[in-house]
Design a protein with these regions (language model features):
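Terminal, non-globular segments
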Residues: 27-505
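Short, intrinsically disordered terminal tails adjacent to the first/last structured region
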Residues: 1-26, 362-363
Length: 505
């Protein structure tokens, strides 16, 4: 039986025997791949252990701790989080077994990232050889992917499932009903991790459309994939619509031509630099007199390049419907792109192993150095500066208690979640809301929604009036200070920085 991409051209197998690496070289390549695997797993765990949770991750922990799956589903149905329930359910069962510590909660992401990297390696290896399979692996370590290997969020799972779907499409029999079933199931499962995973079907649709002929029926895998995505999204649409109605119009990362232009540099932050270095190496290793005619592009490579269309489809979706456009939403494009690059390089350099080996060393070294820098300074991972703010707050806690303050009121919604989680006095941490109840910050509104299911303290101005003398207001905005003065409060700055603290009378 043939794989899904073997219908068009026979050039889908690995390199011929004349271009295969020697057995000894293959052993070294496999050893190198094993070393990279261990390195990224170990360093991801180390980084996970040396940085606190931040806002999004604390939401994951709080939702995992909800009393029942019914409560979890109800909370998501009332816009308590942006994500579908798949990842939350995984974390709920995982955390019941292994606890809620930073390493335990982040470990599934590290494992999913490693699994996805190995799937991409195997896929590229089958289509080319072990050397170029490792190039696909190493290229991904130079993308935004490693960051999500130590974050308790669903993006590593999103990546892994996208890689698995690509592997099933390219490396299993075309007409197998079981292959079609698993392809549809994996794409559907990806949608339970992130709503934008519906876009994973786009490159496969483009592949079949560009090769369609009158009378030709869609492949079983494509039919199964469309059904899998459609059925799961239809089941989850009430949850998605609940969040969309409340937040899409004011979402902070809206689509724009500038944002679209920045997508690929965000997916591969050092991509242009690495490309320049690779081209310099290609010029240095050019061997005159050797044949340079490249074989025809493999169908799998062409499919991989179609993964570049996922952010474009996402831009259209964001403009027409969701108003949400962030690079991490397209992490599912990475497996196809990595395999396409490996296949392209194999076609042009399979008679020049030194060129490919140099590019592998460049990518592997750059990814490893970048990861090692993060290992040395995990504190540099500071989304929106909130982890620095958290450290400043925790240093102030005892001084506030010594001053008799028993109500710690935070104006910053992200800091509120983090302080609530790490404070020695979590029951005293309170988020300040607007008196009119018209909250415009999504980070406030999701906390208000979640507060119906997960205990947290929220105050308005009238609550503050009853406990002003025992309250410390942390990091207030200028608008908040002016509003308090207009309300008749005597505002005094106890600490001016790095985290301002206001006492009230």
């Amino acid at each position: 039986m043939r794989s899904s991409l073997q219908e068009t051209t026979p050039a889908t197998g690995p390199a011929d025997s004349s271009t295969q690496a020697a057995p000894g070289a293959n052993l070294w390549l496999l050893a190198g791949g094993a070393a990279m695997t261990v390195f990224y797993l170990a360093t991801s765990i180390y980084i996970a252990a040396h940085r606190p949770y931040w806002f999004d991750e604390i939401f994951v922990v709080r939702i995992a701790r909800l009393p029942s799956i019914t409560t979890l589903w109800t909370a998501l149905g009332h816009a308590a989080d942006t994500m579908p329930p798949g990842y939350h359910l995984v974390m709920r069962f995982w955390c019941k077994l292994f606890g809620y510590g930073e390493v335990a909660v982040r470990l599934p992401s590290a494992l999913a990232m490693i699994a996805g990297l190995l799937i991409v390696f195997d896929c590229a290896r089958r289509l080319t050889d072990s050397l170029h399979g490792l190039i696909a692996f190493a290229l991904l370590t130079c993308s935004l992917l490693p960051y999500y290997g130590y974050e308790a969020r669903p993006y590593a799972f999103f990546f892994m499932l996208s890689a698995l779907a690509f592997w099933i499409w390219t490396c299993t029999p075309r007409d197998s009903k079981w292959s079609a079933f698993w392809f549809g199931a994996v794409l559907g499962l990806a949608v339970t991790m992130h709503y934008y995973a519906v876009l994973n079907i786009v490159p496969y649709l483009l592949w079949e459309i560009t090769r369609w002929k009158p009378g030709k029926r869609p492949s079983p895998k494509l039919v199964a994939g469309v059904i899998g995505v459609a059925v799961v999204y239809a089941a989850l649409s009430p949850l998605a619509m609940s969040f969309s109605r409340g937040f899409s119009h004011g979402f902070w990362a809206h689509p724009s031509l500038y944002a679209l232009r920045e997508i690929f540099p965000e997916l591969f932050p050092d991509g242009l630099f690495l490309f320049a270095m690779a081209m310099i190496w290609a010029a240095l290793t050019r061997m005159p007199g050797r044949g340079t005619t490249a074989p025809e592009m493999q169908p799998a490579e062409a499919l991989g390049w179609f993964f570049l269309s996922i952010p474009l489809a996402g831009f259209v979706l964001a403009e027409l419907r969701t108003n949400a456009f962030l690079p991490r939403y397209f992490i599912g494009a990475l497996p196809g792109i990595a395999v396409a690059v490996a296949c392209w390089l194999w076609r042009y350099s399979r008679n020049a192993q030194r060129l490919s080996m140099g590019i592998l060393l460049l990518l592997a070294a750059w990814g490893a150095v970048t990861q090692a820098m993060t290992v040395r300074h995990p504190g540099t991972i500071d989304p929106f500066g909130q982890q620095t703010a958290l450290k400043h707050y925790l240093k102030l806690e005892e001084a506030l208690h010594s001053d008799g303050k028993r109500y710690i009121l935070l104006n910053n919604p992200m800091l509120h979640m983090e302080a609530s989680h790490y404070s020695r006095y979590p029951e005293e941490i309170i988020l300040m809301l607007r008196s009119d109840g018209d909250e415009d910050l999504p980070t406030v509104r999701v906390q208000v929604n979640l507060s119906h299911y997960s205990p947290m303290r929220l105050w308005k101005l009238n609550d503050l009036e009853q406990h002003a003398a025992e309250t410390a207001l942390i990091d207030p905005t200028t608008e908040t200070v002016e509003a308090l003065k207009r309300a008749g409060f005597d505002v005094k700055f106890r600490f001016s920085g790095p985290l301002p603290v206001v006492y009230l009378q």
